[in-house]
Amino acid sequence: MRKHPQTATKHLFVSGGVASSLGKGLTASSLGQLLTARGLHVTMQKLDPYLNVDPGTMNPFQHGEVFVTEDGAETDLDVGHYERFLDRNLPGSANVTTGQVYSTVIAKERRGEYLGDTVQVIPHITDEIKRRILAMAQPDADGNRPDVVITEIGGTVGDIESQPFLEAARQVRHYLGREDVFFLHVSLVPYLAPSGELKTKPTQHSVAALRSIGITPDALILRCDRDVPEALKNKIALMCDVDIDGVISTPDAPSIYDIPKVLHREELDAFVVRRLNLPFRDVDWTEWDDLLRRVHEPHETVRIALVGKYVELSDAYLSVAEALRAGGFKHRAKVEICWVASDGCETTSGAAAALGDVHGVLIPGGFGIRGIEGKIGAIAYARARGLPVLGLCLGLQCIVIEAARSVGLTNANSAEFDPDTPDPVIATMPDQEEIVAGEADLGGTMRLGSYPAVLEPDSVVAQAYQTTQVSERHRHRYEVNNAYRDKIAESGLRFSGTSPDGHLVEFVEYPPDRHPFVVGTQAHPELKSRPTRPHPLFVAFVGAAIDYKAGELLPVEIPEIPEHTPNGSSHRDGVGQPLPEPASRG
């Protein structure tokens, strides 16, 4: 007789076919938001079919950003979508990789836990995947068991890498019973311009591949650049053996935050609720409708330059971009993000060309020396012009380096970029020295996860947060060198937030009488921003950018800036010059 240890929780699997990047993560997130708005407790999980244990050491150009959870896991960027749409924190177990699964199974084999069995993909690998899927149905820290677990299966049906995950999902349905498991398949319906036709054959083949491994989808998401006509939906329902109510047309939406409305219009949430026999209420659109009004009916527009080294792939800064937009929503403003390659800002003329028409500058996190002098140059330009600046993680470190150079430490640098610098104003954290030296594992060893900080009561950041006790997520190996605090303070830079013991600098800023808004944080506040609850630092930053834009036409004396060079010196005489007093805007 089949056992049902978790009959209270339903499982919904989301797979993809035909092509990658169809929006499985956004589809899953939007459905999760809809079910949450119906009063259900939803949690989510991403299964990634790569052999890396986590994405922490992967190239951002290949993978996009690394999303850090509260408990310190380095996860896929889709977990960020889940948190933003569900408006709740997820644990590190929300991301499962092939690397994690194989590492666990091999470790068990070495300990002799398989009692001499021949260890194979089936059943040992699939059993470990099933264990991790079913574990998501356990009660959370508050003792609440989820009503629904939505699990996104990465990759595309037909990929070799995804097969163990799909097989495990099939076995979960067999184990829990068909009435407790739902399969949602996302497929492409391409439009052929020469013939003016939408083609259903790729979707039919994708579903056939899924059925060949024992999975018949309960519903299909048809991705297209236009609505799929009813006649084609009926054809797909017939050929793929799916209820017509489960064939969902999802044309491209103006904003990702419109997707829940698109799915609701097609009645996907109602179909899922009926199919899984879930308790529910009508969708409460109060909060989401307010968000959509702010998205589509802005009162003004501001331009923010994101000065980074991975700007060719916007996914490398996905959470930063979404946090900026959310900060704009709070002000009923549209934030236009100007993607600026940091290499181009190394000189004053380069910075002026790149930043001359923006209303704020954001310096995001990153690793490695490439582009660092450009980030520092962008800060120098913005500080002299009175442009609002927000620095995140590495951004804080660049603000500190720029401040140090402005008070005579012309060779100030980070130990990360120049281990032999005479003035390492940014130093390796003591517990990271062995790792940086190459004597320990690189992956998963940074200062990761949520840490508390104490803010100075009268600081800009305390005013933004409306409290002096905060907690933010981190991902770094380097910190401000406390031996240089007094010297750096001569620039006017204030260390406005530290760890509770006062040792680690968490926030820096210039007082409002020195600059309208320059704030840096060692943390990654973008990871806690939500579209309906924007992060206070981003709200304050966008507000400062709006004020700057409003003051652009006022008569302001612009000081002349000495030409900036990568080592912080002047082209004229090779001697470092302190920056002129920054322009102040009322």
Curated annotation (Swiss-Prot):
Transmembrane segments: none annotated. GO terms for biological process: 'de novo' CTP biosynthetic process; CTP biosynthetic process; pyrimidine nucleobase biosynthetic process. One of its GO terms (cellular component) is plasma membrane. Allosterically activated by GTP, when glutamine is the substrate; GTP has no effect on the reaction when ammonia is the substrate. The allosteric effector GTP functions by stabilizing the protein conformation that binds the tetrahedral intermediate(s) formed during glutamine hydrolysis. Inhibited by the product CTP, via allosteric rather than competitive inhibition. Residues 1-278 are annotated as: Amidoligase domain. GO terms for molecular function: ATP binding; CTP synthase activity; glutaminase activity; identical protein binding; metal ion binding. Catalyzes the ATP-dependent amination of UTP to CTP with either L-glutamine or ammonia as the source of nitrogen. Is essential for M.tuberculosis growth in vitro and ex vivo. Regulates intracellular CTP levels through interactions with the four ribonucleotide triphosphates. This is CTP synthase. It comes from Mycobacterium tuberculosis (strain ATCC 25618 / H37Rv). The gene is pyrG.
